[in-house]
């Protein structure tokens, strides 16, 4: 039962509710789920087709938003008349919902309307009880939830279905214009088959584990219930209490691994794979002979075969019956995607078809996955693809200076094996993000500014290569390049010492005899290699003494806030990787988060942290010992994040 507006609570799960707080008139769609309590805002999308163009907006959101989520309201950044702005947002949200339903029946549901005062930044929430009322009711309270990802994924799972289709159809050679109608008829025939009694849906877990894996569940088209309201479907308390296989819940295929880390993102959520098969050979009550029908063409005809690669992702609560998850989430998602592909292909039906590929992403700040179609006829760096990604960044409120929706960023929905480790190209295990979980810095009133994203820890003696005493800067460079790889700025492999040396020879910085030597390199050489291999520019800071480094803590903090890249520190014959600073602006007290490439042991996180090979270092420790030597010159290499999407 939906609560009255006087007692209603708006729950905000998304971390970033305002995508463009300084742009009056901006309209955002509030996204919720029929499976969550009423008025729960999971995410928000910016309206990018202005006036707005509801048809274009609905086309985009139908492709972008997984089934299991829906538009529950709107938010406008407006003036001081909060209720007036909120009413405009409600009216727009209701119109969008009608377009998304494509003429289907919509209940006169309560809609959330919100307005943000552009001057103060205050957000006011209201509830619209009915489409026919012009009065809004203020909500009782607004709660901004912590650990919202945990709430989403501990109680829910993803259903993934891939379905490649080769769709042949004929059209009269004398009437090419009829091809569009014939193609549409072929699409409709496929959609009809999804609900046929002889269609079989096989559901199986999409994640391997060391323990037992549940057996796949077979669901037949004749057993599915279509058209049910997802929010009113009876939930199931436990798979163990269900004897009818048709009423098994999604939790039956979810892994209850108590030793696994907390599930707080789509990447490590439980996933169920759905396969679609046709079972035309089901046992018949009477025997019969095979029959073939022949329909001669009345005139010359042409054959077209269209390749359609469907790939849908949906969200379901774990206590939802699998039968309803397939019939009310997966199948409608397949139908919507077929229609979306049809719209794109129709203008090119008689020429070269666009090579469409569907990818799923879970960008930072968005709690749930989103889906996008890319044309592979165009390379990722071509302007048409860049413009597509820019619009997606704008809609989702993502920064426009980093690649978050490239193909390399896509979710990997293949079968995962938790026992496998990250392996580098030479077969040795590389540790990632070793600074996570280390003790605090000891700067009592400090503000920590640290690296953004992930990196791999490179250090002495890895890969069986003895670089002890001379390879620390090479290892720091490898860590930096691994950061650019893991943030998907590049796909090149992390170079070996020899490849780094060869690069410096190729640009004319070193003689050919340098290749294979044990000579040191410094910040200047690292900047040359980053420019040559990645096209990355660098800023270099020079210090006459290590005692000067604490004076630049504020500037270093700004680097980590704005650029977020690892910094190489070179002093004397030693090199380190700087991952962050903790700085108290009042007292000037500071600490440096150092990743030390001089470590020579095994890939043991506990040993590395306990040995101080990754940790916070004060410029002068409690015993009066200086970490940065006063009698040595220091150079800091600050790689600049490329401005790209």
UniProtKB/Swiss-Prot annotation:
Alphabetical UniProt keywords: Acetylation, Hydrolase, Protease, Thiol protease, Ubl conjugation pathway
Modified-residue entries (N-acetylmethionine), positions: 1
UniProt-listed Enzyme Commission number(s): 3.4.22.-
Main EC class the enzyme belongs to: hydrolase
Alphabetized InterPro entries for the sequence: Papain-like_cys_pep_sf, Rhodanese-like_dom, UfSP1/2_DUB_cat, UfSP2-like_N
A single MF term (Gene Ontology): cysteine-type peptidase activity
Keyword check for Signal: no
List of catalytic residues: 472, 596, 598
GO biological process, one term: proteolysis
Family: Belongs to the peptidase C78 family.
Family annotation (PANTHER family): UFM1-SPECIFIC PROTEASE 2
Function text: Thiol protease which recognizes and hydrolyzes the peptide bond at the C-terminal Gly of UFM1, a ubiquitin-like modifier protein bound to a number of target proteins.
Protein name in UniProt: Probable Ufm1-specific protease
């Amino acid at each position: 039962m939906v609560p009255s507006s006087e007692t209603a609570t708006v729950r905000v799960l998304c971390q970033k509710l305002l995508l463009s707080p300084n742009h009056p008139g901006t309209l955002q769609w509030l996204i919720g789920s029929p499976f969550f309590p009423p008025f729960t805002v999971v995410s928000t999308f910016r309206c990018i087709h202005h006036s707005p163009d509801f048809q274009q907006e609905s086309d985009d959101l139908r492709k972008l938003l997984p089934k299991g989520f829906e538009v529950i309201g709107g938010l406008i950044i407006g003036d001081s008349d909060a209720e007036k702005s909120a009413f405009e947002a409600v009216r727009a949200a209701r119109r969008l919902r009608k377009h998304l339903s494509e003429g289907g029946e919509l209940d006169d549901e309560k809609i959330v309307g919100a307005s943000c005062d552009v001057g103060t930044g205050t957000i006011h929430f209201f509830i619209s009880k009915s489409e026919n009322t012009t009065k809004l009711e203020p909500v009782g309270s607004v709660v901004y939830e912590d650990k919202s990802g945990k709430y989403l994924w501990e109680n829910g799972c993803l259903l993934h279905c891939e379905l490649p289709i080769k769709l042949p159809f004929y059209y009269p050679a004398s009437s090419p214009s009829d091809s569009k109608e014939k193609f549409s008829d072929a699409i409709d025939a496929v959609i009809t088959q999804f609900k046929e009694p002889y269609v079989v849906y096989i559901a199986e877990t999409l994640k391997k584990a060391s323990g037992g894996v549940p057996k796949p569940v077979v669901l037949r088209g004749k057993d599915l219930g279509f058209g049910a309201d997802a929010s009113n479907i009876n939930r199931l308390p436990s798979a163990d209490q269900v004897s009818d296989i048709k009423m098994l819940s999604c939790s039956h295929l979810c892994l209850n691994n108590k030793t696994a880390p907390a599930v707080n993102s789509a990447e490590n959520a439980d996933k169920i794979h759905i396969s679609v098969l046709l079972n035309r050979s089901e046992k018949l009550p009477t025997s019969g002979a095979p029959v073939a029908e022949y329909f001669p063409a009345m005139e010359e005809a042409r054959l077209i075969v269209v390749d359609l690669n469907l790939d849908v992702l949906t969200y379901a609560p774990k206590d939802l019956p699998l039968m309803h998850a397939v019939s009310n989430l997966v199948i409608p998602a397949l139908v919507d995607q077929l229609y979306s592909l049809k719209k794109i292909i129709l203008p090119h039906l008689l020429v070269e078809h666009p090579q469409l590929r569907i990818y799923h992403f879970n960008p930072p700040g968005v709690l749930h996955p989103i889906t996008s179609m890319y044309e592979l006829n165009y390379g990722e760096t071509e302007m048409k693809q860049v413009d597509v990604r820019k619009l997606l960044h704008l809609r989702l409120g993502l920064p426009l200076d980093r690649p978050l929706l490239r193909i390399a960023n896509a979710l990997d929905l293949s079968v995962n094996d938790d026992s496998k480790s990250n392996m580098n190209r030479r077969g040795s295990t590389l540790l990632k993000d070793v600074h996570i979980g280390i003790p605090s810095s000891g700067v009592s009133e400090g503000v920590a500014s640290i690296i953004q994203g992930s990196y791999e820890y490179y250090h002495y003696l890895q890969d069986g290569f003895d670089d002890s005493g001379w390879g620390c800067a090479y290892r720091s460079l490898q860590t930096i390049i691994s950061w650019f790889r893991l943030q998907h700025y590049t796909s090149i492999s992390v170079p070996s010492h020899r490849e780094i040396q060869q690069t410096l020879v190729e640009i004319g910085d070193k003689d050919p005899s340098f290749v294979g030597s044990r000579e040191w390199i410094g910040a200047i050489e690292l900047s040359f290699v980053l420019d040559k291999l990645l096209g990355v520019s660098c800023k270099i800071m020079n210090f006459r003494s290590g005692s000067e480094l604490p004076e630049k803590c504020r500037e270093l903090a700004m680097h980590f806030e704005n650029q977020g890249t690892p910094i190489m520190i070179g002093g004397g014959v030693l090199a380190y990787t700087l991952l962050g600073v903790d700085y108290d602006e009042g007292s000037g007290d500071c600490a440096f988060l150092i990743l030390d490439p001089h470590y020579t042991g095994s890939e043991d996180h506990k040993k590395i942290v306990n040995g101080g090979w990754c940790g916070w270092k004060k410029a002068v420790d409690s015993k009066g010992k200086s970490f940065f030597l006063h009698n040595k010159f220091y150079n800091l290499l600050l790689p600049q994040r490329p401005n790209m999407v």
